[in-house]
Design a protein with these regions (language model features):
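Polytopic transmembrane helical bundles with strong interfacial aromatic enrichment
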Residues: 1-297
Length: 297
């Protein structure tokens, strides 16, 4: 049995690792969105034509390694890095004094292999656009959970004293609109040209009509965010909540600008990749805004 002094020492050492590992989880999953986008935008979605193996012969590409195989295999390899980070995060929280973070660290750790399984199903279904859509949304959810983990680490007291009011209701509406934007965006992608492979099926929906719907939902999202900024200022809410809402609005405007430019320039891959990064940033920013608003009211 460890002495109290030894136990406190171990807790302190573990505490030092919790925050960096939380950031590693967040940034690693953002990178996974970017590399997953690279897989799709370069037509490398079936660079490893099966799952969980890369080919029928093994887990790594065999024979002449082409660019598509290298990109897809690199994306899969990143998942193993995220698994290691997730396990390290669970161990750190279990050994730290922050017992309130343990359950969330386990959820994050389970989310990584779940997301990988969904990716495997996407490969086994020849990049079915609905499965690919869900695959991306899983990453967005993990990014949001990583932000929640970091926020709770920073605000251990506030996390247990959350109240609700009209401004929080507006923040929830903004959060819901953000997720509607993300979902419709994946459906738009499923109808467009960047399928991940030349033979991959599309969802058969009209990309022009879907793009219009996506734009309409974005305008709703921006309007709600503007309303939230004004409501937070009018109610003299905590500076952290006002700052979070302003950052969210700035991210939305930048993301919307990229979206409009890519639409009118025939979806160049660089802009589509930036738009994917923007989507990951939206998920992080809207989660942060909701948490700060709930804590400030």
């Amino acid at each position: 049995m460890r002495s109290p002094g030894t136990s406190r020492e171990a807790d302190t050492r573990a505490d030092r690792w919790v925050r960096p590992l939380g950031w590693a989880t967040l940034l690693g999953n953002v990178v996974l969105v970017i590399t997953g986008g690279a897989v799709r935008l370069t037509g490398s979605g079936l660079g490893c034509p099966t799952w969980p193996r890369c080919t029928d012969h093994g887990f790594t590409p065999h024979g002449a390694l082409n660019l598509h195989s290298a990109i897809e295999f690199g994306n899969r390899t990143l998942t193993f890095v995220l698994v290691v980070i997730a396990i390290a995060t669970v161990v750190a929280t279990m050994r730290s004094s922050r017992r309130d973070l343990r359950r969330l660290s386990i959820v994050l750790a389970l989310g990584v292999p779940l997301q990988a399984v969904v990716g495997g199903i996407a490969v086994l279904t020849d990049l079915n656009p609905w499965v690919v859509s869900f695959h991306l949304l899983c990453s967005m959810a993990i990014i949001g959970l990583a932000v929640l983990f970091l926020w709770r680490h920073r605000h251990p007291v506030a996390a247990g004293h959350i109240r609700s009011g009209p401004v929080t209701g507006l923040a929830w509406a903004t959060f819901g609109a953000a997720w509607l934007v993300l979902y419709v965006g994946t459906v738009v992608t499923g109808s467009g040209p960047h399928a991940g492979d030349a033979t991959a099926p599309r969802n058969g929906l009209d990309p022009l009509q879907l793009s219009q719907l996506h734009a309409d939902v974005v305008f709703l999202f921006v309007g709600l965010t503007l309303g939230l900024v004004f409501a937070l200022r009018a109610t003299s809410s905590a500076p952290g909540a006002v700052k979070a809402a302003k950052v969210l609005l700035a991210v939305e405007l930048a993301q919307g600008g990229i979206g409009f430019v890519q639409y009118f320039t025939n979806l160049p891959v660089v802009l589509v990749g930036l738009h994917l990064f923007g989507a990951a940033t939206i998920s992080a920013a809207v989660t942060w805004t909701l948490l700060e608003t709930r804590a400030s009211e």
